[in-house]
Amino acid sequence: MKEGRPHIDNPLKWAISGKICCNGLFTDIGTGLEQTSEVNLKTRRVVKIDGKNCGSQSALGHHLSALWVTPSMDRLFAEGAAGRRRFVDRLVVGLDPEHAARVTEYESCMRGRNKLLKEGAYNKEWLSSLEETMVTSGVALTASRMGMIEKLNKITREQYGVFPAAELGMMGKLEGWLFDVPAIEVEDKYRASLLDSRQYDCHS
């Protein structure tokens, strides 16, 4: 791993690079700040893989991932489920970078649906389109979360010792359905559930 030093004329310039070996194949990766303006010292993030510029830093997720727990997260298992789901999402993204896009897509469509329902007068085709995206993205991301939980449970079961192994699980409507029926049937059930709950959700 090689770390570049800041330039004296512009301390904002910075870069770090390294060589990763996976299954005997080496990949050069690097990231840093590149100056875009001589006038106001503006910079932008640059990511390179094997010497080629990448469109975004998400490309790094196809080669490596990192996860950490900070002191501010020590209430993770004592507070609401939303924070724990976000933490599981970070674990999933470490193995499947596309998961982040599915989460963003689902949350964006959910907010759009809630807004349309609260406004009262809405285009039914547009509302159905938002719900359809919620169905496909929601079931897919829930299945990915459950898959990650099962991976963690498998690891804890393989640990030998006198200390009891932790058993993790996720509880929710989609999670419960996915335990019982195939994903395609869960999509049908979720689609019908969203349709049936429109009247209730517009007042919630």
Locate the predicted segments by residue.
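Nucleotide-state sensing region of NTPase/ATPase domains
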Residues: 2-83, 89-99, 153-158, 186
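Aromatic-residue detector
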Residues: 1, 11, 61, 65, ...
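Conserved NTPase motor "head" modules and their coupling/switch loops across ABC/AAA+ ATPases, GTPases
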Residues: 4-5, 122-204
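Generic serine detector
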Residues: 10, 17, 37, 56-58, ...
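Short phosphate-engaging motifs
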Residues: 83-84, 148
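Long, non-coiled-coil amphipathic alpha-helical linker/lever segments
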Residues: 88, 95-145
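Short, surface-exposed, polar/charged, turn-prone segments marking secondary-structure boundaries
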Residues: 75-76, 94-98, 104-106, 196-200
